[in-house]
Amino acid sequence: MTQTIQTQTGKNSGAGRTYEVRTFGCQMNVHDSERLSGLLEDSGYVPASEGVTPDVVVFNTCAVRENADKRLYGTLGQMKAIKDEHPGMQIAVGGCMAQKDKQTVVDKAPWVDVVFGTHNLGSLPTLLERSAHNHKAEVEIFDALEEFPSVLPAKRESAYAGWVSVSVGCNNTCTFCIVPSLRGKEQDRRPGEILAEVKALVEQGVSEVTLLGQNVNAYGVNFADETLERDRTAFSKLLRACGEIEGLERLRFTSPHPAEFTDDVIDAMAETPAVCPQLHMPLQSGSDKVLKDMKRSYRSKKFLAILDKVRERIPHAAITTDIIVGFPGETEEDFQATLDVVEKARFSSAFTFQYSPRPGTPAAEMENQVPKAVVQDRYERLLALQERISEEENRKLIGTTQELLVQADGRKNDRTQRRSGRSRDGRLVHFTPEGDVRAGDVVEVVITDAAPHFLIADGGVASHRRTRAGDMTELGETPTTAPVGVGLGMPSIKKPEPTTAGGCSTGGCGCE
């Protein structure tokens, strides 16, 4: 949309100015925000203290959720008064909504200083500097990826758990989804660079890593070297290779696509001790007709067959899902098919959404949009069914011993003084702590009660292992990962070479 930036931002262009990044949306946005924070601090900005108005506010936005535009512009409206009271304050808007709306952001909110998209995260410091110098808004949206996010520095949010992108973009054409048009076609990182980033995090105390992509099990479809043939076993190889990294205790991934989910991935999950017994597998609908209209290239029978295979190899796996209610043309019969699949699948939990038209998607133009009242009724019925199943599945764990990675989200309430942690299968557990239990430490507890969305362990702590991540949390420190260069092709997967203190591989370079 605009010319490529020619000037280079000075290393200390932030000159001690404070910043805050506010994130809306998915895990991909959360990870992108870590990159934005790393970029700003690399340019001299410092995080704003709690309760202090920052000099720069960056909104990393979502265009998928219902009313995402109203939420953004409503928030920007509130920011105008704050900016009027703080001369020199800058507001930047990035992410999927910025990629979609472009100049419209400034037209609707003229007090915004910078608009940047999903393909040019690295432009943010320069755009802030240029806007301040020129005293006008800078809007820069690229139609294709400028640089892989892995070449940007990152300031991690957590001392004990980290995101690592395996790819960006998506090659699917789901009729309800706007993500491919905003993030582009899938592009995959070299496995050697993924392993180097995982190893760098582990060396700084991180014990849990989640591999992240719009469709992680399609990994290997589009490396930078287009002459290389696709390797359909690339993701399972990556899981096994990550599992060989010493010190990595928990490995997760999100999200796979049922059409691409193969037996070699199930085998890698079952045979790699670090891989957690958890699978998030989006269903979207249990109706084959609706799945066809959604352009989801699988049917309910195949979906359930995958779950059977996973449970055969990993009997105690916790399986979660995404479901959309009220897709255009969905009949009561279609919805009943979804309820039937949910009953058979026995998900430990489900993220359920009421369909909302997203401008620019084929589904938004479809006939037979389902009335809002009907969608609400079906949503409540689905929710009630899944709540029952979730509680039934959780109650099966009463009396079992669970290993928890303690979380940093404080105590559950003042009366019980419970802390929270995640079991290896991803379930949330509220437990009664004993002694100096820190976020990032590992405890074992016995489950004493259950509810649909969490487990309770009020019998004390059976064991407590202090960790380096706990030490980092106590010091108020989080890992940082330095830029990883862009490389070509897909080398054979092996354990990563030793990394420098900054987290870069000593000899490799890769793509994200």
UniProtKB/Swiss-Prot annotation:
Entry EC number(s): 2.8.4.3
Disordered: annotated span: 473-512
Keywords in alphabetical order: 4Fe-4S, Cytoplasm, Iron, Iron-sulfur, Metal-binding, S-adenosyl-L-methionine, Transferase, tRNA processing
The Radical SAM core domain, residue ranges: 156-392
Catalytic activity reported: N(6)-dimethylallyladenosine(37) in tRNA + (sulfur carrier)-SH + AH2 + 2 S-adenosyl-L-methionine = 2-methylsulfanyl-N(6)-dimethylallyladenosine(37) in tRNA + (sulfur carrier)-H + 5'-deoxyadenosine + L-methionine + A + S-adenosyl-L-homocysteine + 2 H(+)
A Pfam family per the record: UPF0004
Cofactor note: Binds 2 [4Fe-4S] clusters. One cluster is coordinated with 3 cysteines and an exchangeable S-adenosyl-L-methionine.
Signal peptide as annotated in the record: none
Highest taxon of source: Bacteria
Subunit structure of this chain's protein: Monomer.
Protein name: tRNA-2-methylthio-N(6)-dimethylallyladenosine synthase
Organism classification: Bacteria, Bacillati, Actinomycetota, Actinomycetes, Mycobacteriales
